[in-house]
């Protein structure tokens, strides 16, 4: 991976032949990198800091509305060394099986949602690359950032 995005306090690496798109509003920022085929990786920063579980549930509701055949599998992943609310899903679209991977975590500045997706035929070769993009994602962490679901008082026990 030779291209690097640095801006808005975040950094990630992505392949040179992928195309980067940025959309922003006062409430959120979305950065998406598209492969030459149909796979993509997307990061959305939600500045009103909604609960990560609500964010994942909202995305899952959208997938359920769009696809009639969908399987959802909970996952355990980290973003920027923080545990996330995570899941993977498989869905059928035009006789092809697609997969999407969702990760959400809340920080003191935003809730981050990573979503990457592709057709199974592409993911045989691109899933590792999509995971490397996710693994390269970094932002300045605040000492107040907590893992989801763990109250602050657990730090003193």
Residue ranges with predicted function:
Residues 60-108, 153-157:
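Signature of long, low-cysteine stretches enriched in small and polar/charged residues
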Residues 18, 113-157:
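Surface-exposed amphipathic alpha-helical segments
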């Amino acid at each position: 991976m030779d291209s690097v995005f640095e801006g808005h306090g975040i950094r990630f690496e992505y392949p040179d032949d992928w195309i980067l798109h940025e959309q922003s509003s006062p409430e959120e920022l979305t950065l998406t990198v598209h492969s030459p085929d149909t796979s993509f990786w997307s990061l959305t920063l939600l500045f009103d800091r909604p609960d990560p579980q609500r964010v994942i549930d909202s995305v899952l509701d959208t997938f359920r509305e769009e696809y009639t055949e969908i399987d959802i599998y909970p996952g355990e992943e980290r973003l920027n060394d923080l545990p996330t609310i995570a899941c993977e899903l498989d869905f059928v679209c035009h006789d092809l099986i697609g997969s999407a991977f969702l990760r959400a975590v809340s920080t003191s500045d935003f809730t981050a949602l990573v979503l990457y997706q592709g057709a199974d035929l592409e993911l045989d070769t691109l899933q590792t690359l999509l995971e490397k993009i996710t693994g390269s994602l970094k932002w300045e962490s605040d000492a107040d950032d907590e893992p989801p679901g763990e109250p602050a008082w657990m730090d003193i026990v």
